[in-house]
Amino acid sequence: MVGRRAVDWAVLGAGLFFAAGLHGDLQAGDRAYGMTGDAPRVILWAWEEPEDLRTADPRQLGVAFLAERVFVAKDVSVVPRRQRILTPEGMWAEAVVRIEAGRDFEDNAATRKRTAEVVLDAAQLSGVRGVQVDFDALESQRAFYADVLRQVRAGLPAGKRLEMTALVSWCSQQQGWMRALPVDAAVPMFFRLGRHVGWWGVREPLCEGSVGVAIDEPAIANESLHGSQRVYVFAPRSWTAEQLTELNEGTIPRDRRGAR
């Protein structure tokens, strides 16, 4: 049996803390665009929901948990995670930082620097192996985003991975704006595509090693398990013990509870 002493990330004041450390060292990435590092093949996205993942098998599953949201306007404000996560000891973990641009978004040296600092703070959480940035940047915001990622890369400790989520349309461009980004990998989000399902193929090398799917879109989610990519799985509500059991066994569960 896998050890079940829980790791508990929760909010304490303005930051996150953990109750028991994760063990094991990061393997330094070589910047290859495939499945690098020691992460398991299937990673659970854990958004702003109370999560109990203690029945997950850390040999099979990892977690990318929302650590904080960053709102960029004339200045930068930060909202830390407010919901508790319980995980089994030794589970591979990655901090996710969600960036959102307000109507009065300002791109300047100060907002770029502060945003990068927030991402770096999340990367310093004990037990996390790296950081994933989630920002649906408009074309006019891409220079801002690229510079934030460059500053984060420059400040990351050796061995910590830097990843990003990516719209599928970004990944469809072979020589697009992503080609010079200093990230280890980008995760194309193959869900919530509506009528655009099947429109885009992946041509950007950064996007070739991973895929993001949702359990309430089972056709695409199940197909992802037949490939060789790392699979990030999103659930619209908190993960259940039943769903985790299915994932432990190598299958994608259905979202039987329906939408909110």
Predicted segment positions?
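Secreted glycan hydrolases and related glycan-binding modules that recognize and/or cleave
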Residues: 4-9, 20-260
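Sec-dependent bacterial lipoprotein signal peptides
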Residues: 9-15
